[in-house]
Regions:
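Helix-loop-helix junctions that connect adjacent transmembrane helices in secondary transporters/permeases
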Residues: 112-113, 117-143
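C-terminal substrate/ligand-recognition segments
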Residues: 141-166, 170-175
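Beta-rich nucleic-acid/ligand-interaction surfaces
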Residues: 181-192
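Alpha-helical scaffolds flanking conserved acidic
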Residues: 91-94, 163-167, 186
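C-terminal catalytic subdomain
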Residues: 175-181
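Conserved small/polar residues in nucleotide/adenosyl-binding loops
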Residues: 193-199
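Glycine/tryptophan-enriched, flexible segments
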Residues: 1-119
Length: 201
């Protein structure tokens, strides 16, 4: 073994520095989480109820990784944004925070949701094992623009818009007939937010 002290000689790290591209999009810590929240509150919360449905608009908080890692709490957000924007937008944003908490509650009490079908009729479903289809989905090469855009965004940034997540998940299961657990494994591997909990609910 090389005793020069050069850790690179141990070949412990991947040759492709995947984390570098994530650092262009994310900074960690409470300070940055609060800055991102305030930017959303002042620029994206108004119009949230309708705007959140359109991936190209800025009516999304992109706070999921910061909430996941405890850099900002739902309580801080809940009590800070009241009265700063139209009530319908604040209320809808609060409902999304509530849905997130409900998702964690479900997984805490029913951990089997991460590995088993809720509807047992699907236990014998003949899922496809087509590796080419799976790879095309993972890399964003399906030929369906909205699916490919979402999967490429996930790969490049570790994040995907909520509405697009629903589309790509539905495409994997209903169109490609690939087991949802395979898709969940991919999301957990490349998502900055580790989506197991919110996605399952």
């Amino acid at each position: 073994m090389d005793s020069s002290g050069d850790i690179s000689s141990l070949n412990l790290l991947p040759k492709h520095h995947w984390k570098d591209k994530l650092e262009k999009h994310w900074r960690i810590g409470e300070k940055f989480a609060m800055e991102k929240y305030i930017h959303f509150r002042d620029n994206g919360l108004t119009g949230y109820k309708e705007g959140r449905n359109f991936p190209a608009q800025e009516n999304v908080s992109v706070l999921s990784p910061h909430l996941h890692f405890g850099e900002i709490s739902p309580h801080q957000i809940w009590f800070d944004d009241k009265g700063v924007c139209p009530e319908k937008d604040v209320a809808h944003f609060h409902s999304e925070l509530g849905w997130r908490e409900f998702s964690y509650y479900l997984i805490y009490h029913f951990p089997f949701m991460c590995t088993e079908n809720l509807n047992k009729r699907f236990d014998k479903f003949p899922w496809s094992t087509n590796h080419d289809f799976l790879l095309a989905w993972q890399k964003g090469n399906t030929g369906y623009p909205i699916v490919d855009a979402g999967m490429r965004q996930l790969w490049q940034t570790g994040y995907m818009h909520n509405r697009v997540r629903m589309i790509v998940a539905s495409f994997l299961v209903k169109n490609l007939l690939i087991d949802w657990r395979v898709g969940m494994e991919w999301f957990n591997a490349v998502s900055y937010t580790h989506l197991t909990l919110p996605t399952n609910a």
